[in-house]
């Protein structure tokens, strides 16, 4: 009997960036997934997660976000979910006070986190309520589309994921939630990839490819400029088994320095 096709679930993730001190490198905020989670358990990943119905409710309130001009409902939902999930998973909040051009500072972000993050993660409040009660404007314009990956066909759990770049708000350091993730770190792409090679970190294939791509940039500005100047090519890897090993094929034009990659034994 042929397995029922699994429809990919819309999801978003943000690569939060800051310039490393004393080096020509950037650092990205990453977290270790809890080992009991059924997708990417134990993996080092960027903060993110699924689009939910609450994100759709925010779309209908354009006075609650900036940077939505010219975007359809789908594009808006991916961006709103990216900011919400990043706040839930890291405490970092990409938002402005109403009437201000500046992102909220670390002190205000900490107050909002202390008051609402746990309740939001537990489903006891909504992101819409958090935004309204704190007079916030979600900074969708801070997000730079970077990549679009869809889990291969045939997998039991599939995601249709947009990756965004964003400069981390000044002094917002971030921290894992202790539930879905058990550790967090600001790390250069070089260090993260070295950890994957040594076995210190478990890196999913899309994470590895995006870290390699990101590691070519020497500053946050360079990364944002580079990401904002290129078309996004959707990547849905195709897996093949050959001589006891596995290969993943992705579009060469997606910009990951190759088309066929060895990913371990079959």
Question: What is each stretch, according to the model?
Answer:
Residues 1-266:
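N-terminal leader/linker segments that precede catalytic domains of diphosphate-processing enzymes
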């Amino acid at each position: 009997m042929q397995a029922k096709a699994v429809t990919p679930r819309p999801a978003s993730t943000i690569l939060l960036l800051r310039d490393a001190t004393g080096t020509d490198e950037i650092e990205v905020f990453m977290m270790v997934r809890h080992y009991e989670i059924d997708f990417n358990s134990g993996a080092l990943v960027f903060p993110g997660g699924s689009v939910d119905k609450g994100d759709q409710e925010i779309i209908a309130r354009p006075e609650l976000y900036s940077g939505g001009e010219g975007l359809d409902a789908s594009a808006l939902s991916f961006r709103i979910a990216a900011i919400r999930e990043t706040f839930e998973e890291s405490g970092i909040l990409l938002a402005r006070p109403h009437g201000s051009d500046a992102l909220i500072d670390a002190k205000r972000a900490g107050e909002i986190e202390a008051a609402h993050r746990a309740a939001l993660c537990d489903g006891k409040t909504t992101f819409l309520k958090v935004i309204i009660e704190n007079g916030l404007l979600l900074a969708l314009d801070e997000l730079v589309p970077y990549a679009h990956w869809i889990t291969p066909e045939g997998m039991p759990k599939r995601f249709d994921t947009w990756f965004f770049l964003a400069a981390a708000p000044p002094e917002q350091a971030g921290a894992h939630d202790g539930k879905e993730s058990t550790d967090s770190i600001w790390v250069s792409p070089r260090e993260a990839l070295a950890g994957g090679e040594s076995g210190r970190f478990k890196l999913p294939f899309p994470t590895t490819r995006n870290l390699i791509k990101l590691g070519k940039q020497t500053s946050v500005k360079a990364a944002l400029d580079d990401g904002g100047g290129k078309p996004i090519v959707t990547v849905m890897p195709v897996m093949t088994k050959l001589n006891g090993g596995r290969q993943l094929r992705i579009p060469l034009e997606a910009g990951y320095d190759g088309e066929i990659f060895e990913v371990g034994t079959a």
